[in-house]
Curated annotation (Swiss-Prot):
Keywords, in A-Z order: DNA-binding, Methyltransferase, Restriction system, S-adenosyl-L-methionine, Transferase
Homology family: Belongs to the N(4)/N(6)-methyltransferase family.
Identification of the protein by name: Type II methyltransferase M.BstVI
EC number of the protein: 2.1.1.72
S-adenosyl-L-methionine in keyword set: yes
One Pfam family, short name: Eco57I
GO molecular function: DNA binding; site-specific DNA-methyltransferase (adenine-specific) activity
Organism: Geobacillus stearothermophilus (Bacillus stearothermophilus)
Gene Ontology biological-process entries: DNA restriction-modification system; methylation
Classification via Gene3D superfamilies: Vaccinia Virus protein VP39
Catalytic activity: a 2'-deoxyadenosine in DNA + S-adenosyl-L-methionine = an N(6)-methyl-2'-deoxyadenosine in DNA + S-adenosyl-L-homocysteine + H(+)
Keyword Transcription: no
């Protein structure tokens, strides 16, 4: 369990200096300004890489105007502020700053005084809680910690939730860090951070998106999905966000996508973002985007292109959601047991009554694109009315559960409901087995839709769609198209290797045409397996159904590459 005094170590991912310099340049913390007149904050300074770069710029600002840095020491105490919770990181950052200041000729007492003014060991989320009376900063920069909620002590997360309105659903800790950082901006302040892009699209980020769009102005975004901006590898895709207070009067938002990080790419990015100078047309290392309007409310941020955004909006306005009454599709997730090693069994290897066993399909079973069943079953401890079975009626199952009682009772679901200690986390509905459905794995870099004619119960790593008013084969064909992948790509979090999350929250955003609107010819072609084997031919049919022009489907396919 992570406590208030140790969570930062679980989110410690340090930023490469080239990225630090890019962020400082984009926020405007540059040595051509009189930086002693500005306040800069790093809310989670880690090993001090942002603070080191900021101090160099502060000193250069003085030197280029003919000052010796220690001449103005009385003016420097409020220029820098760094917060760090973890003692080990705090001490490392302190040592780094000592070395920097020694290089500028400060005496030991001067160094100690400055550093004591500049850095604080504290929990940023509990620091300056009253933002109406808090010190305000002209620049807030850094790399907020990436820590999952479940790693935080219950009492501490309750404090955070009470204080930060953006903590929603299972929001990671960088979300309230961003909120508090924004709250501490001065009237003309600028935030420049590098963090996961998950909040821009997924469910848990919706309140932060609304908080930003209602109260601040997004200025620049640098999409770093395919680069390595940190000293250690991360699985979530990072991006740089530069956000200003509402007092900033320019509405244009500029964004950059790059697959490499080099000095030239960083310079090209700055030239475009700061001065609208586009890079050489021959350069394939960087793509640029301009938005005359930003997204409203809690809408997902789709930065890849204005054209993609316009196409998506037209599709959203023209076609109903997949679970709308006109479709009557249902999206569900498979069963979570809390102890798969106990609840998922091979009937040939255990002595359990067959009445409580349901055939189970897993992600591994559908990896080939069709079901190749492993023979596994899941134990169903529920009656048809949703209550738990009486174990005395199933003596062999009772003996089996008693053999594994310690594992079963150690699950959270059992601890919360001791009288129902042998239930699975999710209730099991046996009737699902016999319903035709489409199976979709959680993470994939392409649409992977496998039909189950009505023989299996899905495992919890699988989402499934009940076809409702649709012919299941026609629905599967449409879901395999680039148009449907475009919906997922637009809304879903991307992981390493261009992997998309095909979670229920994103699947539910898919738009479908009215099944009655399809012609007989379109239906026949979509039911032809040869069509599904040709992505290009399939996409041409589905584009026709969605009333997309040849240019529009090409824009979609280019974006997905």
């Amino acid at each position: 369990m992570v406590t208030q005094h140790s969570y930062r170590m679980h989110g410690a991912v340090y930023t490469k200096p080239i990225i630090v310099d890019l962020i400082l340049d984009l926020t405007g913390y540059t040595s051509d300004k009189n930086l002693e007149n500005f306040k800069l904050l790093d809310p989670s300074f880690g090993d001090g890489v942002f603070l080191e770069a900021a101090v160099h710029r502060l000193m250069d600002s003085l030197i280029r105007r003919g000052y010796r840095p220690n001449e103005l020491i009385d003016h420097l105490g409020n220029c820098i502020r760094g917060i760090e919770l973890r003692l080990e990181a705090y001490q490392a950052g302190r040592h780094r700053l000592q070395k920097v200041l020694e290089g500028y000729g400060f005496s030991k007492p001067e160094i100690n005084w400055l550093i004591n003014q500049w850095i604080i060991q504290a929990d940023f989320l509990l620091w300056q809680e009253d933002t109406t009376e808090a010190i305000k900063f002209d620049f807030v920069v850094g790399n907020p910690p990436y820590v999952r909620q479940e790693l935080i002590q219950d009492e501490l997360i309750k404090k955070y939730r009470k204080r930060y309105t953006t903590i929603y659903d299972r929001a990671d800790l960088y979300v309230p860090f961003i909120q508090h950082s924004l709250e501490l901006l001065s009237e003309q302040g600028t935030l420049g951070i590098i963090c996961s892009d998950r909040f821009t699209k997924n469910r848990y980020g919706k309140k932060l998106r609304k908080f930003i769009t209602d109260n601040y102005k997004v200025r620049y975004i640098v999409d770093l999905h395919k680069t390595s901006p940190f000293e250690n590898e991360v699985t979530a895709y990072p991006a740089i966000y530069v956000i200003k207070t509402k007092n900033y009067d320019k509405s244009v938002v500029r964004a950059v996508y790059t697959e490499v990080i080099t000095s030239k790419v960083c310079q090209d990015a700055k030239d475009f973002l700061l001065s609208n100078q586009k890079p050489d047309q021959s350069s394939k290392e960087m793509k640029t985007y301009v938005f005359s309007e930003w997204f409203a409310g809690d809408e997902p941020w789709i930065i890849q292109s204005q054209e993609c955004r316009e196409i998506l909006r037209r599709l959203e306005n023209r076609f109903p959601l997949i679970e709308d009454d006109v479709h009557s599709c249902k999206i569900r997730i498979g069963v979570a047991t809390g102890a798969d090693k106990v609840y998922i069994v091979d009937p040939q290897q255990v002595d359990i009554e067959p009445e409580v066993l349901l055939p189970l399909v897993t992600t591994a079973d559908i990896s080939s694109g069709r079901i190749i069943w492993s023979g596994k079953h899941v134990i169903n401890p529920f009656n048809s009315d949703g209550g738990l079975i009486n174990l005395d009626d199933f003596p062999r199952l009772k003996t089996y559960f008693q053999q594994h009682e310690e594992i079963i009772k150690n699950r959270n679901v059992a601890k919360k409901n001791p009288s129902q200690w042998f239930r699975t986390i999710d209730r099991i509905y046996p009737e699902i087995v016999h319903q035709p459905k489409l199976l979709i794995p959680d993470m994939k870099n392409t649409n992977h839709i496998v039909k189950d004619d009505g023989a299996f119960y899905p495992h919890h790593n699988l989402y499934y769609i009940l076809p409702g008013n649709w012919n299941i084969d026609i629905l599967r064909a449409i879901l395999l198209s680039s148009v449907v992948k475009f919906f997922i790509w637009s809304y879903a979090t991307k992981m390493r290797g261009d992997t998309l999350r095909y979670q229920a929250q994103y699947l539910r955003k898919i738009r479908l045409p009215d099944p009655k609107s399809l012609t007989n010819d379109q239906k026949e072609r979509l039911m032809d397996e040869r069509v599904i084997q040709s992505q290009e031919y399939l996409d041409s049919i589905v584009a026709e159904i969605y009333q997309l022009s040849k240019t529009e489907i090409e824009i979609i396919k280019d974006a997905l590459e």
